[in-house]
Amino acid sequence: MTDFKEFADVCKQIEHISSSLEMTDVVSDMLKSISTEELPVVTHFVMGDVFPAWSVEQLGVGTSLLYSALSESSGLSLKEIEDLVRSTGDIGETAVAALGKKKKNKKKNQASLSFFSEDAASVSISIMDVFERFLDISRYSGAGSQSSKMRNLQFLFNSSSSEEARYLARLTIEDLRIGVGEGIVRDAISKAFDVPAGDIERGFMLTNDLGLVAVAAKEGGIEEISKLRMELDRPIKMMLAQVTPSIEAAIKDLGMLAVEWKFDGARVQIHKKGDSINIFSRRLENVTLSLPDIVEAVKLHVKADSAILEGEAVAVDENGAPRAFQDILKRFRRKYDVETMVREIPLTLNLFDILYLNGDVLMDQSLLRRREQLVACVENCDSIKVDEQVLTDDVNVVNDIYAAALNGGHEGVMLKNPEASYSPGKRGKNWLKKKPIMETLDLVVIAAEWGYGKRANLIGSYALACFDPEDGKFLPIGKVATGFSDEQLAELTEVFSELIIGESGREIELKPDVVFEIAFEEIQKSTNYGSGYALRFPRLVNVREDKSPEEAETIDRIESIYLSQRG
């Protein structure tokens, strides 16, 4: 088994590399050197993930629990750990400093390790040891779960050198901070096992798991990769739409359009296997238990033995009109007394795509062919229906549909290439969206500041970033401090307190996890931010709990808006 120290050494090497090609070479060499059992684990670890995106397992360790584990393992007080976070600005460097200053208190350490019937201080830990402890942590719940998680974390830190602890601490909150994303890992797998990058990408699209793809590439190359299949209850990334400046531009780009309403709802991916139904949010979280009405509608009205469907769940009032987006999020968050919430906020499901049907993968088929099969297997009713679609290249017809969608209280229209296949996780011109001119941006919160005066205990100013899909980095684009109520600031402070990965004075660095919908007056060129742009008069519109950080606006989109402003 490979020692975790070897993984930490590779991470340290990568952290000092700026070239994506050099990073790819280092990751490739590491993937070639490890066992098949370790391969999927390391593939995820090097991206800062513990489990694949589709997995129901969630590590769920917040910074407060991590601080406590470092305190217990090092013998430093909790305040000393918090002070180290402020002085170093990084939880990894905090772990290095804390374990470097480790106080000699053998009695305390031995007591904390008795649960494991082994002396952690006397053994080195392997990569698989770390993964198995993380797996145990993810499965603890209920009374006593925090102390059980704590004991596992203590074991790991007591088994680690201070250098190993740097990456162990970061991995615990799934933010490795070495700049390795999916693109680099895809290319590293390709190079390590001599499989074309396109085949690796194809396998990833079908499985949503680069770990599985890496194992297939190692064991059988292209032949084994070609055997990878989409599977029920393993959600794949959802295809994304690009904003079009006008309907005329969309027709120029695509010619004939498949026009659909863009509903003001929450996107879902539904997996049906007989009467077993699982529903996943656009962040690939399993929300089945919160949506029993959608489950029942699919059972009754989708006539297929097995299927993977996509659609929008829309909250409606007594007249069938759409309710506020926040009401939908209440449904998705609800875990207790769900039936009461079902009565208070009923949902309808508008289906628009099908990716899998009765054992056949459909995503390579055209949108029109997929839609034919979707229509054939769904019985439309009040609770579930296939979204209406019109094929046209007439600007006036599209404008009429657009106006009808807006008058119905929805966001606008989707303009799709009727001949396009389905591309998981890809944003491009095959799917376009047209919304009103007052555009908003979905941006990731990467840092923040504690407030002043009566708001001193609240986080009140947030640093925003767009996404660069080429290297998986988040690029700062400005700050927002307006549009928040005191109640909202209190709620957000509670959320962000568990995402702190560094602190210096009033400034805090956050794990990129939360997406804000931001209104703005203008995008300007700026040398103050890493994106090269800044927002003029940004203000909060919504917290987009349904969106993942990687679904934030891309740097290309920011540049496009900037150029369009200039005419």
Curated annotation (Swiss-Prot):
Kindly identify the residues recorded as the active site: 262 (n6-amp-lysine intermediate)
- The positions annotated for binding ATP are 260, 267, 282, 312, 352, 427, 433
Q: Tell me what reaction this enzyme catalyses.
A: ATP + (deoxyribonucleotide)n-3'-hydroxyl + 5'-phospho-(deoxyribonucleotide)m = (deoxyribonucleotide)n+m + AMP + diphosphate
Q: State the top-level EC class.
A: ligase
CDD domains, per database record: Adenylation_DNA_ligase_Arch_LigB (cd07901), OBF_DNA_ligase_Arch_LigB (cd07972)
Q: What is its EC number?
A: 6.5.1.1
Write out the entry's keywords from A to Z. Answer: ATP-binding, Cell cycle, Cell division, DNA damage, DNA recombination, DNA repair, DNA replication, Ligase, Magnesium, Metal-binding, Nucleotide-binding
Please list the GO biological process terms of this entry.
cell division; DNA biosynthetic process; DNA recombination; DNA repair; lagging strand elongation
Please indicate which superkingdom the organism of origin belongs to.
Archaea
**What GO MF terms are annotated?**
ATP binding; DNA binding; DNA ligase (ATP) activity; metal ion binding
Write down the required cofactor(s).
Answer: Mg(2+)
The record ties this protein, via InterPro entries, to:
ATP-dep_DNA_ligase, DNA_ligae_ATP-dep_bac/arc, DNA_ligase_ATP-dep, DNA_ligase_ATP-dep_C, DNA_ligase_ATP-dep_cent, DNA_ligase_ATP-dep_CS, DNA_ligase_ATP-dep_N, DNA_ligase_N_sf
Q: What Gene3D superfamilies does its record include? A: DNA ligase, ATP-dependent, N-terminal domain, DNA ligase/mRNA capping enzyme, Nucleic acid-binding proteins
> Which NCBIfam families does the annotation name?
dnl1
Task of the protein:
DNA ligase that seals nicks in double-stranded DNA during DNA replication, DNA recombination and DNA repair.
State the family it belongs to: Belongs to the ATP-dependent DNA ligase family.
Name the UniProt record assigns to this protein:
DNA ligase
In the UniProt record, what gene is named as encoding this protein?
Answer: lig
